[in-house]
């Protein structure tokens, strides 16, 4: 895994839009990872079911998002391996991310949100209960040695902002301060990511090169999200790496986040679809022709992305349900013509119905590649100063027919 080298600039802009409300830009992290980008969210401590070699075929620079909750059950093994490695010459690490840039997140992206008991975060995995405090968090960072790590906080959802009591706000801030002071003592060069939140007071806490906007993706409309982010980011100097974690992270949510200036958008959507037996399949506009205003495009995204039954759903054609029986005989059509995975829809349908592991592997690789391709087009359009038009054309060419 890549650690931050003090001789390099952690994040630098390559080109940007000068609009105050729409500060979208292209950049590079640690001289290798081009932004805007989306990491592969690991369901387990490793990016199961794919290997690093597989991910390297999808992403030019592997970028992994690892969850605290997936590391906690492995903590005794990690500690034992670390102890033995000091006394024995071992050929490789127990968890070897092989050149990937890694980001350790507190959010549970595939499960229900965590709770607090006696100042411990509580996770439930495989019917087992795990507790996380600031000292355990520090231990995990020292063992995993990620490139970046979020500071765990009780993430208050902006969709429930009117329900925040003074007691809850104070608890949120105290929890953050406690974790921050402990994690500063980590022995490695992991970059801590500062959360920007109305409940957090940043007093004498130094400069951060990476920031996140927590609490989004839980029912607020995209227009509400825009207004809140604009308010929360009003005092930023603009040089920080900007990160947002989304609970769903659909294509339209991705485009919305990039327009608002986020460099890293964490989305479990490709992996969630893979578990559901669904394949991403959308058109990428080949020609960019129009001069839409950003405000118009934001309203269009708000109209076409709705919060339904606890998740965000795009009102466009972007998903193929390969469990559906209509694909049993579709041996000619790939999941998407643009994909690196050339298996037919009928073949994947067969694998899914037989509960073959290869079905999940093929779908995971396909969906991650589709998102990587979307982000590459986003980066190209920013460089060509056509991002707003690209977003508008993307929505138009994927609209569902009435």
From Swiss-Prot:
GO biological process per UniProt: tRNA-guanine transglycosylation
Pfam families: TGT
Keyword Glycosyltransferase tagged: yes
Organism: Theileria annulata
Gene Ontology terms, MF aspect: glycosyltransferase activity
Protein family membership: Belongs to the queuine tRNA-ribosyltransferase family.
Protein name: Queuine tRNA-ribosyltransferase-like protein
Keywords: Glycosyltransferase, Transferase
Entry-linked Gene3D superfamilies: Queuine tRNA-ribosyltransferase-like
């Amino acid at each position: 895994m890549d650690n931050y080298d003090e001789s390099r600039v952690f994040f630098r802009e390559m080109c940007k839009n000068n609009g105050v409300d729409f500060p979208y830009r292209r950049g590079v992290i640690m001289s290798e990872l081009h932004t805007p980008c989306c990491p592969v969210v690991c369901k387990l401590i490793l990016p199961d079911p794919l290997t690093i070699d597989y991910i390297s075929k999808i992403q030019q620079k592997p970028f992994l998002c690892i969850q605290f909750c997936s590391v906690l059950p492995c903590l005794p093994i990690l500690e034992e391996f670390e102890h033995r490695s000091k006394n024995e010459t071992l050929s490789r690490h127990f968890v070897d991310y092989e050149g990937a840039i890694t980001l350790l997140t507190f959010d549970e992206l595939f499960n229900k949100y965590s709770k607090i008991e006696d100042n411990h975060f509580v996770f439930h995995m495989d019917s087992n209960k795990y507790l996380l405090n600031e000292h355990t968090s520090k231990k995990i960072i020292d063992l995993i040695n990620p490139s970046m790590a979020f500071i765990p906080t009780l993430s208050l959802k902006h969709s429930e902002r009117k329900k925040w009591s003074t007691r809850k706000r104070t608890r949120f801030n105290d929890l953050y301060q406690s974790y921050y002071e402990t994690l500063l003592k980590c022995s490695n060069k992991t970059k801590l990511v500062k959360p920007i939140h109305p409940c957090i007071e940043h007093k004498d806490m130094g400069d951060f090169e990476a920031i996140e906007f927590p609490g989004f993706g839980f029912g607020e409309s995209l227009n509400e999200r825009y207004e809140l982010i604009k308010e929360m980011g009003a005092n930023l100097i603009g040089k920080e790496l900007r990160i947002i974690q989304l609970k769903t992270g659909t294509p339209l949510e991705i485009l919305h986040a990039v327009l608002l200036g986020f460099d890293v958008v964490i989305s479990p959507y490709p992996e969630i679809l893979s578990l559901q037996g669904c394949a991403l399949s959308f058109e990428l506009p080949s020609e960019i022709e129009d001069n839409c205003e950003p405000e118009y495009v934001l309203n269009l995204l708000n109209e076409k992305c709705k919060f339904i039954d606890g998740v965000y759903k795009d009102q466009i054609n972007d998903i193929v349900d390969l469990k559906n029986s209509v694909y049993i005989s579709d041996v000619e059509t790939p999941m998407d013509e643009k994909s690196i995975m050339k298996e037919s829809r009928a073949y994947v349908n067969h694998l899914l119905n037989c509960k073959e592991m290869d079905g999940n592997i093929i779908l995971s690789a396909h969906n991650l590649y589709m998102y990587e391709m979307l982000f590459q087009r986003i980066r190209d359009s920013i460089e060509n100063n056509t991002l707003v038009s690209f977003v508008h054309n993307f929505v138009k060419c994927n609209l569902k027919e009435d």
